[in-house]
Amino acid sequence: MAVARHGCPPWGSILGLLVLALAAAAAWDVSFLRCSLGSFCECDFWPDLPGLECDLARHLAGQHLAKALVVKSLKAFVQDPAPSKPLVLSLHGWTGTGKSYVSSLLAQYLFRGGLRSPHVHHFSPIIHFPHPSHTEQYKNELKSWVQGNLTACGRSLFLFDEMDKLPPGLMEVLKPFLGPSWVVYGTNYRKAIFIFISNTGGEQINQVALEAWRSRRDREEISLQEVEPAVSQAVLDNPHHGFWRSGIMEEQLLDAVVPFLPLQRHHVRHCVLNELAQLGLEPREEVVQAVLDSTTYFPEEEQLFSSNGCKTVASRITFFL
């Protein structure tokens, strides 16, 4: 899904295009002045938080907790000229609920080069750490990579996907970089951002959402306090999670546990409409309904939540066009 920086104006209107042009010009002037007077935009770091907030509001369906936590955490961190530690967020939830999408938006709206920026680093266990027997080698390589890149630029973003599939103990080498005590040669590493993504805790989050629905509570009434303890405990109990028996959890180096709720049918519909718009296609109702009807839902009795969230929406649309 493409990202429009600076303004996120209404689509398809002359007024929207005018707003985009004016917003871009104003943002350029302000950003140029801001970068000229300080180190705010060092290393390709060019944050557009209003654009991020707008994009999340428009395109991230059913995730009031994730939206609020991500935006609040980033605003406080980016606006602090001397943060005491790096920003560390751990994203949890069922498959297809928006975790990877949010992480890609962070790269797009924080760095001019987006995911292609040399200061955005994405790690996948399947690609980078495929053999558990090589864990010690991976530890040395990961520590060297993180330290080397932080030495080059303290304003770096590190994304760790599929934390459920990492070799045990690997993440422990990151602990010195996540707190306030580590010194990296010549740069302020405390300006770095670390994002960890996993499905662990998804079942616990789903259960909270299901109980809220059964109690006829509004979904937006679900609070972080209802889900965070269960998610944290699920991480501690999962020997396959990268934070299992980790000092990162014990020393409370995570700034926020960000829960992603399971998606209902109307949320999947929102994803279908977004994808059709992205493809430049009219929202044909027969295509929308075909995608929704072909999606599987759970629990078996209520048929309430999408089994794959919005993950398979794009491929299903292609099939039904």
UniProtKB/Swiss-Prot annotation:
ATP binds at G93, W94, T95, G96, T97, G98, K99, S100. It holds the Pfam family Torsin. The keyword Nucleotide-binding applies. InterPro entries: ClpA/B (IPR001270), P-loop_NTPase (IPR027417), TOR1A_C (IPR049337), Torsin (IPR010448), Torsin_1/2 (IPR017378). Keywords: ATP-binding, Endoplasmic reticulum, Glycoprotein, Nucleotide-binding, Signal. Residues 1-27 form the signal peptide. GO terms for cellular component: endoplasmic reticulum lumen; extracellular region; nuclear envelope. It is found in: Endoplasmic reticulum lumen. One of its GO terms (biological process) is chaperone cofactor-dependent protein refolding. Gene3D superfamilies: P-loop containing nucleotide triphosphate hydrolases. Its main location: endoplasmic reticulum. The keyword Metal-binding does not apply. Homohexamer. Interacts with TOR1AIP1. Belongs to the ClpA/ClpB family. Torsin subfamily. This is Torsin-2A. It comes from Rattus norvegicus (Rat). The lineage of its organism: Eukaryota, Metazoa, Chordata, Craniata, Vertebrata.
